[in-house]
């Protein structure tokens, strides 16, 4: 099987598309009177946990693959798990970039209303979630390299 690394510009395109979509939804929400900005606090927690799990899986695959077969412990990494870890890391690159753009895009039009308590909380939620998504994207690149 021949697997190629995800080019950096795929993540850049996903980030820009997410940025445009997030900003568009925030502007649409402001003009229509219904808001779709912000995110619950459990979202960055769940995304962070997924990132840590993916990193641990990628490290396990790398340790198994990089060790001399004669010196390997009696452990075995299932090829399906190794492949799924690689796919998870590739998905985290694109999803992390798109979601970081989405939440970052929501911040741009609403930053002018930050004096309101709702908008202040929404901007904070979006900023934290965007940072976690960027970290997930980085973990995806590292995990892909490790696999």
Language-model-detected regions and their locations in the chain:
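Membrane-water interface at transmembrane helix exits
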Residues: 25-30, 59-66, 105-109, 144
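Long, highly hydrophobic alpha-helical transmembrane signal-anchor segments
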Residues: 2-51, 104, 116, 120, ...
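Membrane-helix interface/capping segments
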Residues: 58-82
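Loop-to-transmembrane boundary segments
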Residues: 83-96
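Hydrophobic alpha-helical membrane-embedded segments
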Residues: 41-63, 137
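Alpha-helical transmembrane segments and their immediate juxtamembrane interface regions
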Residues: 2-5, 115-147
């Amino acid at each position: 099987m021949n697997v190629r690394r995800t080019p950096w510009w795929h993540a850049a395109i996903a980030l820009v598309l997410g940025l445009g979509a997030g900003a568009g939804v925030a502007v649409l929400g402001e003009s229509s009177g219904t808001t779709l900005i912000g995110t619950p606090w459990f979202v960055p927690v769940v995304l962070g946990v997924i990132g840590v799990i993916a990193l641990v899986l990628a490290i396990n695959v790398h340790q198994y693959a990089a060790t001399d077969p004669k010196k390997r412990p009696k452990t075995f990494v299932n090829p399906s798990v190794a492949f799924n870890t690689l796919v998870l890391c590739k998905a985290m690159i694109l999803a992390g970039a798109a979601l970081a753009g989405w939440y970052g895009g929501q911040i741009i039009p609403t930053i002018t209303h930050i004096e309101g308590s709702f908008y202040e909380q929404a901007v904070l939620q979006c900023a934290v979630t965007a940072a976690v998504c960027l970290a997930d994207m980085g973990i995806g690149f590292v995990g892909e390299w490790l696999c």
